[in-house]
Amino acid sequence: EKKVTDKCAFYGVPLCKVPDRYVLGGAIGKDARVVVAVTDEGFARQLQTMLDRSLWG
């Protein structure tokens, strides 16, 4: 986790943490995932919005 956090901070990449790998996988329609990189800005914004709604109400 620290390595990914440090890399994101160094390169100025937004980071969104979720409680477990199943939430992350479900958000992109896949099986459990530990890390996902999203290069499409529109999809990244929508994914972050969906995760925020599902995790924090």
From Swiss-Prot:
GO terms for molecular function: RNA binding. Gene3D superfamilies: 3.30.1330.30. Keywords: RNA-binding. Signal peptide: none annotated. Pfam families: Ribosomal_L7Ae (PF01248). It comes from the Bacteria. RNA-binding protein that recognizes the K-turn motif present in ribosomal RNA, but also in box C/D and box C'/D' sRNAs. Belongs to the eukaryotic ribosomal protein eL8 family. This is RNA-binding protein YlxQ. It comes from Geobacillus stearothermophilus (Bacillus stearothermophilus). The lineage of its organism: Bacteria, Bacillati, Bacillota, Bacilli, Bacillales. The gene is ylxQ.
